[in-house]
Amino acid sequence: DLAPGITLDIMTPSDVSFLDVERGKVDMVINRFDSMPQSFHQIHLWDDTFSCILNVDHPMLENFTLDNYLAGDHVWVSKTGMGVGVGVNPDDVQRLGWVDLAINKLGKKRQIRVFTRHYQAAMTLAEQNDLIVTLPTRAALLKRDNPRVVLRDPPLDIPPLELKMAWSPLLQHNPANRWLRKLIADTARELDGQEPTL
């Protein structure tokens, strides 16, 4: 037990604004960022590829081609849990995700049937239905030993995502925050040294 008195409040990206981080109300954010205020401190944690999860009885398993992938029914994990162009706060409106940007570059679209904010919910849905979930490999590996699912490489090139940790300049020298950032960075380096394998 490195910090027996610590309390963690882990939130999804749509629950936090950059203003909360900037003011030091949030200790740090860990995510992929398309853009970030220049005043924030940040470090790279790791790069991740993508994997697909399908249930063992999925009819496309034997012929997991791009055309079949696109014709299948998908679960999309988005920061809002809602589709493109939908959001309670206009600043949180979801744009195309990493996977759909790669598909869009091919001039194609996929059939998204379920939107959720949670990887675990998406993986459970794929386990119990004929749905395809495409998500970061490190998340997919949580189901590696589950006999009800199969992990596959996506049948298209999806650029890897870069996971970063960012925090406010107000917390740069805070001893508790520095300790936690170091612990997270050290753990990420340890994990990054272990190549994810399907």
Model segments located where?
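Secondary-structure junction motif
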Residues: M60, F64, L70-L106, N174-P175, ...
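A late-sequence structural motif
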Residues: L66-D67, V77, V149-Q194
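Short Pro/Gly-enriched coil loops immediately N-terminal to beta-strands
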Residues: F40-N55, D67-G72, P154-E162
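Short secondary-structure boundary segments
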Residues: F33-D34, V56, G81, P136-A139
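Central regulatory/effector-binding core of bacterial HTH transcription factors
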Residues: D1-P37, T116, L198
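Ligand-binding "clamshell"
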Residues: M36-T49, D130, K143-D153
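Residues at or immediately flanking beta-strands
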Residues: G5-D9, Q111-R113, V150, E162-K164
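Hydrophobic hinge/microswitch elements
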Residues: P13-S17, E22-V26, V88-V150
